[in-house]
From Swiss-Prot:
Protein name: ATP synthase subunit beta
EC number: 7.1.2.2
Chief place of localization: membrane
Catalytic activity: ATP + H2O + 4 H(+)(in) = ADP + phosphate + 5 H(+)(out)
Membrane topology: Peripheral membrane protein
Gene that specifies this protein: atpD
Listed GO MF terms: ATP binding; ATP hydrolysis activity; proton-transporting ATP synthase activity, rotational mechanism
Pfam family, one: ATP-synt_ab
Annotated source species: Paracoccus denitrificans (strain Pd 1222)
Amino acid sequence: MAEANGKITQVIGAVVDVQFDGQLPAILNALETENNGKRLVLEVAQHLGENTVRTIAMDATEGLVRGLPVKDTGGPIMVPVGDATLGRILNVVGEPVDEGGPVEATQTRAIHQQAPDFAAQATASEILVTGIKVIDLLAPYSKGGKIGLFGGAGVGKTVLIMELINNIAKVHSGYSVFAGVGERTREGNDLYHEMVESGVIKPDDLSKSQVALVYGQMNEPPGARMRVALTGLTVAEQFRDATGTDVLFFVDNIFRFTQAGSEVSALLGRIPSAVGYQPTLATDMGAMQERITSTKNGSITSIQAVYVPADDLTDPAPATTFAHLDATTVLSRAISELGIYPAVDPLDSNSRILDPAVVGEEHYQVARDVQGILQKYKSLQDIIAILGMDELSEEDKLTVARARKIQRFLSQPFDVAKVFTGSDGVQVPLEDTIKSFKAVVAGEYDHLPEAAFYMVGGIEDVKAKAQRLAADAA
């Protein structure tokens, strides 16, 4: 087919109208034009009539003028995939942004793909150990599952996702892909340098790197922020299909994907739905989330940070995301205000695989006992606030004392938060976590002070800290 050429007729911010003489390009096709000597990619969003298409720009449109020639590439945005992307930072259209020269890829892949059909999907459940006590015990992650980290502004989503990258990606033998969607450029820069330091990215020999980075940060136009998650996912899908291994796919932040979709929707003149979001919110989210799945070839384990506007979990953006996830880790401002980090809410967080058939009877029972004590403490808090601790029965006083110890024991120092805490991070094996909490619930450590349980690893660390505290007091 002869390639179609058109010209720009109108530019409104990130929306560009292009008129063609002959064949109109299909919806989602990529068009190319030149802006100030740089390639600018436009994605077709609507057919308007009079041989005109309305497109969304994937980069800044300053400098475009009416009459500029545009050519149709004949297909969707194609990005480089495979080993050539390892150790590199790409943008939404697959161009390198790390000053490391062109990406020498032998393969490219369209960013819009169909989700695997039912017959191709795999359903095995196996726990993915993170080394973080509160997660492994109460809301365990599954290999090949979708995991969401929900939280408002400043409660520690990015720190938690960085720690998960630190704990899982560094010891993970396969590949990882990190998609930075509408977040701070500084954080993306820090992550790259951290990965170089830890040897996950090897700048001297990129072929030995284990991670590919795809960034579309806060300063990008909405078109780029809306599509960059798909670019990252496309790179991850190729690793899954080609290597047959478990690929880790980190997204920070999935809310920005929805937010960018809402901006684009308004620019295209669609009537907004609830709270000003796009009417296609569930469709957009579903089209992306259904592609993140495990097939008979390999699996993608995705960990997604989800910003919660105004700490309201019923907001349409986080509420739509909930439906797609296997495990949800909810970060709570009330817990972060107590100084307990990670500020995971042990009663709000849950997981599909917290089931005796998957994690075993002992793990399941300990997790439920811990939640039971914390739930009882929560229901007693009103009485304590009004009447004080003295009015409680002896049994309730014991429950409160244990709950406060458990609450503090769920905190843990992180490697990536060393600058804040001044102490080295700790990773706790799952067996230790279960054994430690089982003993605390049973009352074996009722004699130790609350402070000994704060910011430590396993129960041995608690005993050592209690001895130190006793020595200091003496």
